[in-house]
Each structure stands twice: as structure tokens, then as C-alpha cells.
């Protein structure tokens, strides 16, 4: 189960590799689902990153290892827990998203994230 104090891989080209989730802003529970807005602390970065280690950042969860039931027929699970870094106005920091994202993120009004990726599931 994905909850607070979980490490997330970053799936964009912002220069950050991993963040530690410290708060869920979408819900007031500990559980985290796809499409939730989270607050995290940077734990691992690239050498050329403009962001600094241990800064507080915002992110949107796009992939989880947990099984997701779609239309009561299909189960989807990904290989890792991933998020995309955004600013306070929900604009993405990176200019590309690596990997696939689910199509139902479009219904949650994350259209800017939806336009940066190539693969959908």
C-alpha cells in the first residue's frame, strides 16, 4: 500500500531522481492514489539539476505498484511508484515525461501533463 513516507521515482527530465512523500494534499488520509497531489522532499538528484537536495517540492502521482481495477474487468499495475514534479500552479517543471501514464488522468484536469507524454494506457 502506498502511503506517506514512501519514496517516488521522478518520471520527467527535471533532474531529480527520487523524492520522499511527506503529505497528501488531495485527501486528508494517509493513502495515496494515482492523480493525487503530494508534497515531497528531494532525496536524490542528478549532477546537472537546478533543484537542490532536501528542497520541498510538489508532485502528481502517475504510476503505482498497487493494482487498479478499471471498468470492473481489467487490473493495471506498474513496476514502480512514479510522480511528476509541478509548481504551485500545477505547471510541470520538466519538459518531457518518461514512460506511460493512465488515460483517466485527463478526467482529473491534468491536461498539461497529458500533452507532455507519448504513451498512454
Curated annotation (Swiss-Prot):
The keyword Ribonucleoprotein applies. One of its GO terms (cellular component) is apicoplast. SUPFAM superfamilies: Ribosomal protein L14. GO terms for biological process: translation. It is found in: Plastid, Apicoplast. GO terms for molecular function: large ribosomal subunit rRNA binding; structural constituent of ribosome. It comes from the Eukaryota. It holds the Pfam family Ribosomal_L14. Keywords: Apicoplast, Plastid, Ribonucleoprotein, Ribosomal protein, RNA-binding, rRNA-binding. Belongs to the universal ribosomal protein uL14 family. Binds to 23S rRNA. Part of the 50S ribosomal subunit. HAMAP family: Ribosomal_uL14. This is Large ribosomal subunit protein uL14c. The gene is rpl14.
